[in-house]
Design a protein with these regions (language model features):
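General alpha-helical segment detector with a strong preference for membrane-spanning helices
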Residues: 48-50, 79, 203
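A cross-family signal for N-terminal binding/gating loops and helix N-caps
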Residues: 2, 30-59, 65-66, 72, ...
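PAPS-dependent sulfotransferase catalytic domain
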Residues: 23-30, 61-73, 77-198
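Extended, composition-driven regions rather than compact fold-specific motifs
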Residues: 3, 9-10, 41, 80, ...
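Residue-level signal for well-ordered alpha-helical positions
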Residues: 53, 83-86, 206
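Acidic, carboxylate-rich catalytic segments that either coordinate divalent cations
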Residues: 201-208
Length: 208
């Protein structure tokens, strides 16, 4: 997948194919804002869970005394599959298919102009290492999506409140989606592996 990126304040701005069309990805969990909670947001990496916990801290007057700079990574192949499932789902009114998304990912059969929903979806396929390399802060703590219970306990201790457990999203893929995705993956495995290579290395260096 081809894209250009540039920094825009504390965010990244992405341009896909048609350079007149842009999409912006926010870095920090800023709605609601919790002072000293500095989270580098990577799409499809438990961002909704962190936003929900931040909301609890904000409404219950949680306070973090010392800046806590962290991010969450996801196993790259699992993240890619999750992004496809997200793309074919309710968020985009079930208008996109695995074949559609796969073609855009590969740079094939591109529309003359992407819709706002298409551009928004493509942000979820930008590799994780791009968000890390261009982060506006120095990340001190790395977690993966299997560490959410541990992270909840850490944030509870830091903020001085007992953050309620929110069951993170679990991947439940339909049989039809799995068949279609596995077929696409098998046909394009070499390209996918090459595209994810830096993310695979990053994930292994930190967690394995």
């Amino acid at each position: 997948m081809q894209y250009l990126l540039s920094k825009l304040g504390d965010s990244l701005q992405f341009k896909f194919y048609n350079k007149d069309q842009t999409a912006t990805a926010k870095y920090h969990c800023s709605k609601p804002r919790v002072d000293n909670l500095l989270f580098v947001n990577i799409p499809k990496c438990a961002t909704q869970t962190i936003a929900a916990w931040a909301a609890q801290m904000a409404t219950r007057d949680g306070k973090i005394e010392v800046p806590y700079r962290f991010t969450i990574l996801r196993e790259p192949y699992g993240r890619l599959k999750s992004a496809f499932a997200y793309g074919v789902g309710a968020k985009y009114q079930y208008k996109f298919t695995v074949e559609d998304i796969g073609n855009w990912f590969l740079g094939k059969q591109l529309p003359d102009k992407f819709s706002p929903n298409q551009v928004d979806l493509l942000v979820h396929f930008v590799p994780q290492h791009e968000f890390i390399a261009n982060a506006p802060i120095e990340i001190e703590h790395y977690f993966n999506t299997g560490d959410m219970r541990q992270l909840r306990h850490i944030l509870s201790a830091l903020s001085g409140i007992d953050i309620n457990w929110m069951q993170e999203n679990t991947s439940r893929y339909s049989t039809q989606f799995t068949i279609e995705y596995n077929k696409w993956f098998s046909l394009n495995e070499n390209y996918i592996h090459s595209y994810l290579q830096k993310d695979i290395r990053l994930y292994k260096d930190i967690f394995l």
